[in-house]
Amino acid sequence: MYSVVCLIGSTKFESTFRELEESLTLKGYLIFSPLVYNQSGDKPGCGKKAKELIDVATKLKINHSDIVVVVDVDGYMGNSTKAQRDHALFLNKPVLYYSKGEVSRL
């Protein structure tokens, strides 16, 4: 059986997400990742309501994951990411941090 990894973090790190998606997929992991990258805030239909919907969807992805990876380039974590991380910890999911090099353990 494949382990499911959920990547969480600010979508301003899209290139890091993409690199992790590829490298972890090639190692045999199933990946949940942001599917909407709208850091600039200019995508049509991506207002406050969409952000709330995406936050709920991310928590559902965490519920179905075996491992959560926080994509925290240079240690940066916004409020949404902190809430998602706390949700994972509440569920006793292993949480690894990109900034600490912990992803290499996968």
Regions found by a protein language model. Name each.
Residues M1-L106:
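Conserved catalytic or regulatory cores that recognize and/or transform ribose-phosphate-containing ligands
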